[in-house]
Amino acid sequence: MFTVTPAKIYLNQEKTPVSEQFNDVYFSNQDGLAESEYVFQQGNHLWERWIVYQEKHFVIAETGFGTGLNFLAVTSLFRQFRQQYPDFPLKRLFFISFEKYPLPKDQLQQIHRLYPQFSALSQQLCDYCLDAIQGCQRFHFAETTLDLWFGDIADNLPQLGDYMQNRIDAWFLDGFSPSKNPQMWNDKLYQQIFYYSKPQGTFATFTAASAVRKGLISAGFEVQKRKGYGKKRECLCGIKNSTQQQNAKFPWYLNQPASLLSEDIAIIGGGIASLFTALSLLKRGAKVTLYCEDEQLALNASGNKQGAFYPQLSDDDDRNIRFYVHAFFYALQQLQWAIKQGIEFEHEFCGVALCAYDHKSAVKLAKISSYQWSKSLYQNLNKEQLSEKIGLPLDCAGGFIPQGAWLAPRQFVQNAFSYLQQLGLEIKTSQKITALDYRNLQWVLTNEQNETFNHQVVVLANGYQITDFVQTAKLPLYPVRGQVSQIPTSANLLKLKSVLCYDGYLTPADKMKQSHCLGASHIRNNKDRHFSHQEQRENQQKIQQNLASTDTDKNMDWLQDIDISANIARIGVRCSVRDRVPIMGNVPHFEQQCLDYRNIFNLRRRKQPIPDAAQWKNLYLIGALGSRGLTSAALLGETLASLIYAEPLPLSEDILHNLSPNRSWIRKLLKGTEIK
């Protein structure tokens, strides 16, 4: 359901990889690299176009990633371009590729050894290789961003969605010959390629098959034959000479990029959502100013001493599972990046244990196991195996996430913000912004002292206080109080090797081997931040009751070491929404949308035109991360930055719809329910 089938290959006499699934070579027996350069780079006139290109990023899409040779070759070419023309407008290459049967890491490495000139790029690509999960995974290289979509292109290409209409500059139509892979080469594919191509966008392909040529012409391309590579007589290339703009299929969820004139962006917040949004914006060259109402950063929901880091693998909506797995993998990338930059924070990639402590949790974990995740992501363990993983006896089975971890959120956020200041981030603390007003093509921010600050774009990332503004007051967000207990360690508790999750969580000892974090309460619509003796007791009772053993021979004495008597705890107020899914994107104009869509149920039924969603211009938000901010913030921040800059988005359209800030009232309106 979520995982994809790996490729099966062998090397022929010419040492060329051959697919067992398609009984076809991945590239020419003569010279795969020369073929790639001739067919795809020259066929799309890349170098000549880059020299005169006036935008900041160029987008290439490819229909079959295969060995990654096309990616390595064009990334190397773009690096040469940037080195030769560092002051030209074009700064970044986006490479979108689709792959139904991904090659395992060891086979990629074996094939790439044929091309030692790409050894550094190949190593970075192979280091990124994690589990191939249905959907998009984003990987960053020096000058290139790779969006690798795993799964059938017939399922994934439509998931680029309304947003990507007219945004792709060039296509590499690859993916085995049409006679060997007829399921891919079809009229629907050609129509979608045309839909996503920019006016004057191009394609190139190794084939000259009549059905392919006619299909591309029928879709709207002007198609030319050119000399084929090597022994092939001909191949095809073409251009989209059209400025046609089709109506969006889902206009009520259509995201809108910013109108960027000066790239002057303000972020209101001070936690992990603000951090990763600022990081992604700074990497794009933005001038970013952060406004935080507290004297220090990370004093609210991002301020715990230790936090658990792992994906949510069970949900009634598979979109949420896919989102959290992709977010987890992306966050792993970013954490490794932070470590390489020398950003100091306590952490331990010790794995996370999920306990089947009652019938409901056992059913939930059984459902997770049924998805057949790879063992590197999730392992189903009996109670003896789970006990061994955590280092303490348990009387229940469960699951284990080997790549899970604990880290120190406050330390990470504060030190990472200090690093971002070196990249140009301006931080203004003790600045509570009380009002937003859009005038003269910019946002005017007003603080409690009635001082004003002007910025072109604003991102709201201030947790449950997102709704403090007139523009956001109708968003159905609410505060959730959470108290995390800090308990002393003991000889028994020092044996805990992994994060332990039940109807709460217990972390291993901190780096000083002095204390553990025990969490956490969950009180809706409560933003009080005073210590609660009752919640402290409940944190203790949850672990002792959930994990208590009925086996008198089982030594569970370690549970009695959970000592809350010092009454040390930290209280934070998280931001949540009823469906417990984050929100990210444009700030919707509630009143205008209710007016435009008051009759949307009948408009859809009659197939009448529906306007695009009304949004507040250049105003964005990221929020409702709940207790999953460590996992979700990095990918959400990257997606939001990509949206602001009109770049490809690293999430499928169905997931983006599920993250849309207006989803609560749009779902009602689509059913014909009146919104007041």
From Swiss-Prot:
Sequence segments annotated as region (FAD-dependent cmnm(5)s(2)U34 oxidoreductase): 268-676
Chain's role: Catalyzes the last two steps in the biosynthesis of 5-methylaminomethyl-2-thiouridine (mnm(5)s(2)U) at the wobble position (U34) in tRNA. Catalyzes the FAD-dependent demodification of cmnm(5)s(2)U34 to nm(5)s(2)U34, followed by the transfer of a methyl group from S-adenosyl-L-methionine to nm(5)s(2)U34, to form mnm(5)s(2)U34.
This protein's GO CC annotations: cytoplasm
Secretion signal span: none
Record keyword Lipoprotein present: no
Names of the cofactor(s): FAD
Keyword Methyltransferase: yes
The EC number(s) this enzyme carries: 2.1.1.61, 1.5.-.-
InterPro entries (alphabetical): FAD-dep_OxRdtase (IPR006076), FAD/NAD-bd_sf (IPR036188), MnmC-like_methylTransf (IPR008471), SAM-dependent_MTases_sf (IPR029063), tRNA_MAMT_biosynth_bifunc_MnmC (IPR023032), tRNA_MNMC2 (IPR047785), tRNA_S-uridine_synth_MnmC_C (IPR017610)
Protein encoded by which gene: mnmC
Protein name: tRNA 5-methylaminomethyl-2-thiouridine biosynthesis bifunctional protein MnmC
Location(s) in or outside the cell: Cytoplasm
Keywords from the named record: Cytoplasm, FAD, Flavoprotein, Methyltransferase, Multifunctional enzyme, Oxidoreductase, S-adenosyl-L-methionine, Transferase, tRNA processing
Region (tRNA (mnm(5)s(2)U34)-methyltransferase): 1-241
One MF term in the entry's GO annotations: flavin adenine dinucleotide binding
Annotated catalysed reactions: 5-aminomethyl-2-thiouridine(34) in tRNA + S-adenosyl-L-methionine = 5-methylaminomethyl-2-thiouridine(34) in tRNA + S-adenosyl-L-homocysteine + H(+)
Primary location recorded for the protein, binned into one broad class: cytoplasm
GO biological process: methylation; tRNA wobble uridine modification
Protein family membership: In the N-terminal section; belongs to the methyltransferase superfamily. tRNA (mnm(5)s(2)U34)-methyltransferase family.
